Amino acid sequence: ALFEESTVSAEPR
């Protein structure tokens, strides 16, 4: 769950 939010912030598409 946390990794999903982190990946979104890392790659804002």
From Swiss-Prot:
Brain. It comes from the Eukaryota. This is Brain peptide 37F3.
